[in-house]
Amino acid sequence: MEFKVEKKGTNKAVIEVEVEPEKFEEGLQKSYLKNAKYFKIPGFRPGKAPRSLIERAYGEEVFYDDAIDYVLNETYPKVIEESKLEVVSRPEVDIVQVGKGKSFIYKAEVYIKPEFGLGEYKGVEIKKIEYPVAEEEVEHELEHLREENARFISVDREVQNGDIVTIDFEGFVDGESIENGSAQDYELTIGSGRFIPGFEEQLIGIKKGEEKEIEVVFPEDYQSQELAGKKATFKVKVKEIKVKELPELDDEFAKDVSEYETLEELKASIRNRIKEKNDKRAKDEMIDAILEKIAQATEIDIPEPMIENQINYYVEDVVRNLQYFGMTYEKYLEAIGKTDKEFREQFRERATKAIRNNLILEKIAKVENIQATDEELEKELERLAKMYNLEVEKLKERLSEDDIEYIKEGIILNKAIDFIYENAKIISEETQSESQPE
């Protein structure tokens, strides 16, 4: 087998492959063995007629289709491997020559990862981004901790806004019970807005053990068409009234909810955690700004199949999430009023940017000879094993060579990101002010 590659532009290639006649003959024989049973030749049982008689009766080309498929499947993957082309699409195949006793020649046109020259990627100037920790953020986290550790205490008084009440209720429309319109020991927070407008407000003032008939009107846009806009009566009994009691913010609280001895230590821990989150956000945004500047100085002709594959990835992720909530993709599209094409199109810009950035980082890694070391691979495998609650050796047993290569590629891309960040010129406001003439 011989082949030659012709590049077309920066992201396409045409491969011409010449396969020896013996290989095509092998394909013809396999096609004959597969299909002989479908041909009727007088004097022979199905599948027993010689190939030559079938070809004489039905034409020499009768076994060509499957023979061609066989040769393509046998040779194309080897050609791609030997050519070292980074193919990103299915091939468009054109048969140049085919026939018994002849070399089988075909052309395969494919999209490949684009070739491009890198713009300047060292010393890229960007503004420093910072997100200082606001005291309000710390207070918000503390309030969240208080809410998580609140106690609920029964009280013997009238219902007030904000109370948690336990009720029995039954709803009626035109004197008939509402289907699924009743419940026992139902917990409701007054003022939460979980019930029909007007329901919760009418419970205010009722005491524990009391019953009351509440009249409401279902909203016009209510989910059940049968009830939308209709008047309803609910018979309600208040069985328990509870109030939420938040713990005091003091040293005892800190000891109860954390490993710290004092409230100030707890606050410091929260502050550090928020700072780490804010610093990561700032760094991510600065890296994005660096990549954007490199991209502006770099011209890449991204093949459409690469973009479509990335869009497929995003859509499949949405479908998986919808399935988790018991919803089909078709129903979701109907609910948001979009076609499949419109929904996919909204991911195009994001997909293009993701591919562009990855291509740039791959190129930088290649130019700078950035590799994944054995130690880095082992560390990443340990992290993944911990994530999936597996022993490292068990995880290794499950991973294929392709999986390992994929993990290595991730390590290399992350190191390339670190490289451009460490080599960027990050200018703070103070530096800008100092450099400006008076």
Swiss-Prot record:
Q: Where is the PPIase FKBP-type domain?
A: 162-247
Enzyme class per UniProt: isomerase
Q: Which domain of life is it from?
A: Bacteria
Q: Please cite one Gene Ontology biological process associated with this protein.
A: protein transport
Q: Does the keyword Membrane apply?
A: no
Report which reactions are catalysed by this protein: [protein]-peptidylproline (omega=180) = [protein]-peptidylproline (omega=0)
Q: Which InterPro entries match?
A: PPIase_dom_sf, PPIase_FKBP_dom, Trig_fac, Trigger_fac_C, Trigger_fac_C_sf, Trigger_fac_ribosome-bd_bac, Trigger_fac_ribosome-bd_sf, Trigger_fact/SurA_dom_sf
Q: Does Cell cycle count among this protein's keywords?
A: yes
Instruction: One Pfam family, please name it.
Output: Trigger_C
Q: What is its EC number?
A: 5.2.1.8
A GO cellular component annotation here is: cytoplasm
One molecular function GO term is: peptidyl-prolyl cis-trans isomerase activity
Supply the SUPFAM superfamilies for this chain.
Answer: FKBP-like (SSF54534), Triger factor/SurA peptide-binding domain-like (SSF109998), Trigger factor ribosome-binding domain (SSF102735)
Alphabetically ordered keywords of this record: Cell cycle, Cell division, Chaperone, Cytoplasm, Isomerase, Rotamase
Task: Name its cellular compartments.
Answer: Cytoplasm
User: Domain notes, please?
Assistant: Consists of 3 domains; the N-terminus binds the ribosome, the middle domain has PPIase activity, while the C-terminus has intrinsic chaperone activity on its own.
User: Do you know which PANTHER family this protein is assigned to?
Assistant: TRIGGER FACTOR CHAPERONE AND PEPTIDYL-PROLYL CIS/TRANS ISOMERASE, TRIGGER FACTOR-LIKE PROTEIN TIG, CHLOROPLASTIC
Task: Identify its protein family.
Answer: Belongs to the FKBP-type PPIase family. Tig subfamily.
Tell me, what does this protein do in biology? Involved in protein export. Acts as a chaperone by maintaining the newly synthesized protein in an open conformation. Functions as a peptidyl-prolyl cis-trans isomerase.
Name of the protein in its database record: Trigger factor
Identify the species of origin.
Caldicellulosiruptor saccharolyticus (strain ATCC 43494 / DSM 8903 / Tp8T 6331)
